[in-house]
Amino acid sequence: MGDMMQNRLYAVAATFSVLPVVFVGLRLWARRVKRVKLGWDDFTIMFALVRSSSYLGSLNRARCLFNATVLRIAVSHKTDTAVGGLGKASKTNADGIPIYDNTYWTHMKVSFGNRLSQVLAIGPTKMSVLFFYRRIFGNSGRTIFDNASMVLMIICAAWTVAYFFGNLFHYMPIKMLWTVTADKLPAPNKQLYLTQCYIDIATDALIISLPIPITFDPDPDFQTYYLATITYWTLIEAGLGIIAACLPLLVPIVRKMSWVLTPRSGQDDIPLNPKNPSPPS
């Protein structure tokens, strides 16, 4: 059973070390195809990608090899699975008492790093989507939408900062996590974790539903309406969130490839930026 679980963890590490990088790369290629300048939605998703790599990268003790690269995702996750005992039952002696060895301390360091990096991966992903919404629908006279999206951005930024430092200073001194055995650690603050999750889920739901009223506008701009329909991806947590945030921007690449097989029509190219449309590339 332990080997099966570890194999699954290896598969997860391999998958999410590649897919987010590929989709962010395609996103940037789409920007180049459409000759659209990078915006804050692009910068925040790239930051989220780096932090997502650190989320699993914090599992890696071989930081000298992959300290600043997204390749840390797979290598680090595999390192913790092999060295930190991830996916295996905790070691105990003949009396069932836990054994606190280097494997245990490695895992505790990993868990601490995960909590910090996860917040820094999820928060910027949320903000990237909100920046993308404002790129499409902003400056269009929709005061309610502008105000609502700005309030959500402030909430997401505050959530990121508050829970980063909340997790950072949960135990003081910090090194207590990997120097004190579990039976001597203070009880964790469940309210901290529960409120973090509740606000996380609530902001996800609000972000997903934010553009829906605009799509039911009785007289929408055609280009804006078309782009809105491809933004409803549940870009939630680190890896899948990054992929989902990039998907709406890959239309130019798909169309560019489809032109090889089908002739162009006069209306088959929808600009990514309705305020600054560019001719087909």
UniProtKB/Swiss-Prot annotation:
Phomoidrides A and B (also known as CP-225,917 and CP-263,114) are potent inhibitors of Ras farnesyltransferase and squalene synthase. CP-225,917 and CP-263,114 inhibit Ras farnesyl transferase from rat brain with IC(50) values of 6 uM and 20 uoM, respectively. CP-225,917 inhibits squalene synthase with an IC(50) value of 43 uM and CP-263,114 with an IC(50) of 160 uM. The chain crosses the membrane at residues 9-29, 149-169, 196-216, 234-254. Belongs to the SAT4 family. This is Phomoidride biosynthesis cluster protein H. It is a multi-pass membrane protein. It comes from Fungal sp. (strain ATCC 74256). It holds the Pfam family Fung_rhodopsin. The keyword Methyltransferase does not apply. Keywords: Glycoprotein, Membrane, Transmembrane, Transmembrane helix.
